[in-house]
């Protein structure tokens, strides 16, 4: 049974979150009554208000009003006053992924999973379905630049969603097509072991119906290992690997544009389809790989090669994925969400491919627990940066861990052989340092999942003020 329209007023606790806001927006567009609360004003809160959704700032029991259904994310603590009030009223409390699953039942669904690259790949799949005239509904974990939002209601029969594996609830999503970009040891606080992470992703793919299929990256060792274990489900592989069903090759760069060819091989018939000279307006092998995942989905849905090429060429990117925030003295300043060593390494490698000058990486580590568990990986992920500026850890509410901090990481990076790694005290120290070292042609790349995005937005103006020029 599909979710009826008569469920009553739906209240989102933490409605401004990137995942929650998208679900709230689509529910609203479907005709449901929606309201919510959040701790602070934000762009997402403002956008939802403009659509007519009532939002309270601060969490108070009275915010519930006449709500009959409560939606929460894993970020909401058990002592939240609205959650306590909801349970006292015996109201149904629904996890974010459960509500997303209900929305997916209205459409044929494509779920994009993986430790890294989900948001960009979700956006690319949506772009190719758009180019093919399929007009999908989209719920993403980041702002899609072409839409100006992370969610969009389409008139077509397909829905494209980002599947968040962090708390295991992605296994509730009723996907017809499941994409896995990679599998790394993340979220071990929830899973307990890497083997449990592996098992969850295998189940994610095997959950698709017999008429669906999985799309798996053959370049990632963990995913390739999983391919051979998938039972009784169709699998399409992709990547640079010569054995992949959908293979990218012949990559070259034109400034910040990646040019590449794709070869699609049908296992049963032996048919080979080639799409040459695809132009993706983003640098980086990882972005070409994500685009190839989108091609693997699109070609199976019957989208023509010329529409695929057009969709890739017009792809507008995702906010906080190598987003240009401004220029100063010929140096370009970028904002990126990368906060895991694998992501940081990929972003800096892409920057190196596109940049004619030097790379200045500014990183704000996100969570003491992540820095502690991946400390050695962090020491080697900045190799493509000529200069590294490390800010204090963004705690995200965690307690500090003795010996786990940015100063210790700087020392370890230097000991591992990096020529120029420095610690900065915070945002106020950033612009003066960058003003001294950035030169025309350089890229200054700010990386992290915390408040560093605001630093990236402010930095061009701060640099202009230092130099006495107007931005």
Curated annotation (Swiss-Prot):
InterPro entries the record matches: Mur-like_cat_sf, Mur_ligase_C, Mur_ligase_C_dom_sf, Mur_ligase_cen, Mur_ligase_N, MurCDEF_pg_biosynth, UDP-N-AcMur_Ala_ligase_MurC
Catalytic reactions of this protein: UDP-N-acetyl-alpha-D-muramate + L-alanine + ATP = UDP-N-acetyl-alpha-D-muramoyl-L-alanine + ADP + phosphate + H(+)
Alphabetical keyword list: ATP-binding, Cell cycle, Cell division, Cell shape, Cell wall biogenesis/degradation, Cytoplasm, Ligase, Nucleotide-binding, Peptidoglycan synthesis
Pathway of action: Cell wall biogenesis; peptidoglycan biosynthesis
Known EC number: 6.3.2.8
UniProt GO molecular function: ATP binding; UDP-N-acetylmuramate-L-alanine ligase activity
SUPFAM superfamilies per record: MurCD N-terminal domain, MurD-like peptide ligases, catalytic domain, MurD-like peptide ligases, peptide-binding domain
Gene3D superfamilies: Mur ligase, C-terminal domain, Mur-like, catalytic domain, NAD(P)-binding Rossmann-like Domain
Gene Ontology process terms (BP): cell division; cell wall organization; peptidoglycan biosynthetic process; regulation of cell shape
GO cellular component, one term: cytoplasm
Binding site for ATP: 114-120
Subcellular location(s) per record: Cytoplasm
The keyword Chloroplast appears for this protein: no
Group of enzyme by EC: ligase
Role according to the record: Cell wall formation.
Family: Belongs to the MurCDEF family.
Protein name (database record): UDP-N-acetylmuramate--L-alanine ligase
Species whose genome carries this gene: Sinorhizobium medicae (strain WSM419)
């Amino acid at each position: 049974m599909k979710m009826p329209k008569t469920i009553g007023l739906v209240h989102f606790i933490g409605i401004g979150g990137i995942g929650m806001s998208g679900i709230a927006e689509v529910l609203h567009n479907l005709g449901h009554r929606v309201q919510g609360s959040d701790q602070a004003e934000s762009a997402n809160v403002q956008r939802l208000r403009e659509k007519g959704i009532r939002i309270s700032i601060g969490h108070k029991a009275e915010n519930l009003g006449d709500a009959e259904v409560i939606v929460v994310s894993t970020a909401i603590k058990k002592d939240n006053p609205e959650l306590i009030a909801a349970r006292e009223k015996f109201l149904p409390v629904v996890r974010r992924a459960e509500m997303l699953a209900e929305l997916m039942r209205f459409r044929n669904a494509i779920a994009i999973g993986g430790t890294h690259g989900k948001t960009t790949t979700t956006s690319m799949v949506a772009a190719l379905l758009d180019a093919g005239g399929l007009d999908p509904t989209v719920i993403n974990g980041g702002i899609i630049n072409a839409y100006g939002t992370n969610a969009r209601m389409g008139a077509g029969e397909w829905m494209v969603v980002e599947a968040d594996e962090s708390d295991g609830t992605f296994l509730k999503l009723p996907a017809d097509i499941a994409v896995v970009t990679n599998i790394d040891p993340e979220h071990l606080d929830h899973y307990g072991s890497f083997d449990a992470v592996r098992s969850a992703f295998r189940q994610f793919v095997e959950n698709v119906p017999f008429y669906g299929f999985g799309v798996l990256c053959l370049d990632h060792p963990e995913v390739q290992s999983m391919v051979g274990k998938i039972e009784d489900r169709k699998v399409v592989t992709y990547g640079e690997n010569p054995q992949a069903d959908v293979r990218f090759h012949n990559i070259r760069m034109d400034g910040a544009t990646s040019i590449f060819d794709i070869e699609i091989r049908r296992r049963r018939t032996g048919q080979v389809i080639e799409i040459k000279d695809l132009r993706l307006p983003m640098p980086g092998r990882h972005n070409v790989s994500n685009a190839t995942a989108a091609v693997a989905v699109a070609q199976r849905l019957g989208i023509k090669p010329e529409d695929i090429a057009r969709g890739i060429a017009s792809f507008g990117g995702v906010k906080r994925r190598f987003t240009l925030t401004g220029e100063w003295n010929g140096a370009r300043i970028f904002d990126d969400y990368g906060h895991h060593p694998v992501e940081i390494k990929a972003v800096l490698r892409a920057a190196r491919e596109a940049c004619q000058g030097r790379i200045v990486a500014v990183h704000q580590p996100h969570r003491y627990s992540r820095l502690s568990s991946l400390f050695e990986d962090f020491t080697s992920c900045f190799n493509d940066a000529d200069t590294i500026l490390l800010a204090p850890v963004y705690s995200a509410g965690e307690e500090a861990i003795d010996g786990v901090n940015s100063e210790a990481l700087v020392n370890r990076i230097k000991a591992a052989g990096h020529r120029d790694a420095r610690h900065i005290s915070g945002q106020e120290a950033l612009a003066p340092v960058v003003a001294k070292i950035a030169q025309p042609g350089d890229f200054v790349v700010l990386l992290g999942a915390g408040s560093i995005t605001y630093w990236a937005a402010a930095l061009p103006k701060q640099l202009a003020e230092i130099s006495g020029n107007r931005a």
